[in-house]
Amino acid sequence: MITHPLLHRTRRHFFQDCGIGVGKIALASLIANETFGATGKPDFMRFPVKAKRVIYLFMGGAPSQLELFDNKPKLQEIEGKPIPPSVIKGQRYAFIQPDAAVLGPRFPFAKHGQSGAEFSDRLPYLSKIADDLTIVKSMHTDHFNHAPAQLFMTTGSGIPGRASMGSWLSYGIGSEADDLPGFVVMRSGGNLSGGSAMWGSGFLPSEHQGVPFREGAEPILHVANPKGIDRTAQRQTLDLLNKLNRGTHGKMGDPEINARIEAYEMAYRMQARAPELMDFSKESQETLDLYGVKKGKSNFASNCLLARRLAERGTRFIQLYHSGWDAHSNVEGNVKNQAKAVDQASAALVQDLKRLGMLEDTLVVWGGEFGRTPMVEASAALNRSNGRDHHPQAFTMWMAGGGTKPGITVGKTDELGFHVTEDPVHVHDLQATILELMGIDHTRLSFRFQGLDFRLTGVEPHHAIKKLIA
């Protein structure tokens, strides 16, 4: 359990109350850093720190593992026939009926690299880095609808209002950057069913929530000051505003007022750093081509490059959401389009981090909220054909870097891709693994709220996936 007896006191407030000079503040900061290193770590830091930061590529809508990673020739053999009742007994689905016919894979597969990992021909770039990836084919989740499943993957709960993974990391271990947020969110491809609760701070102090960068040419608004306002004038205005806010906080005691002060201060610092962060002109043409970045175009590729730049500058948790994978109809066309949008840049991010020497301590995670059914979804009433429904029982994700074992595959599914048959990995197990790679014991990182101790991985026993940790 983390305890913060002065959680809602700002540094500025404390220093003003005590009358400490700026020089002494700087000296105290240096001494504090040295003391922390000498006296040990927080109680929840129980493991070697293998990853210092996370870049999470969330594929909203749920990619079809059967068209990308999990090759099932048996489905082709029995296409058009119903799934055996013994396989589907007791299962629930969002749209299809239990007697829906089998749909075979829409694309050919091949083995790649020394690892022999199988990829469909829709992933020509990722397949080239097969030996850098840790593939998990035995993921399963508790939810079969998008909003709760997306929330479950990102916050550990299918109910809105819980703290997201990035918020937990910001709260627990902070950020390496003083002039950039510790938790940044970028989006492409459309809307998300889970909404902004997926990067919310929940019951944690709101300064730990994710900071969304906008889609388009200007990810951060109002970087430049209005005409006639220089940094000195802005600093004076901000100091006055903060003084008024502190006065209000002294009367009301609302911790959100302190969060607002922190937000204003971060915005002020970001104004100086953001232009350099977002300026791709110093990136080589080779790098731009590697990602597939086009000048003046904002998309998943440019978000991946910006994610690498944020990671270089100390942002702890960077979450990229790319939506559009919900293939209830025409799964073939869906996978063609979405894989084309993300394959090159996803692979480029891993390659770029590796050549910069950053992959070793940067964890990259790729995947959606659940998988897709081996059975076809077809409905004349809904104008759907040759699609796949939601499948929480088994799906595939991959990881790279950050202390994971490259070139291995964890878990298996049955010959139909319906059930996990080896090394099942629950969503909370994945979350526990990410925390452990960051040095954190997931059972000890908690926060007391309304009389309960909450943690990202819930109260049921879950464990990190030791097979994939180097």
Task: Please give the residue ranges for each predicted region.
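Ligand-binding pockets and gating/stacking loops
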Residues: 1-470
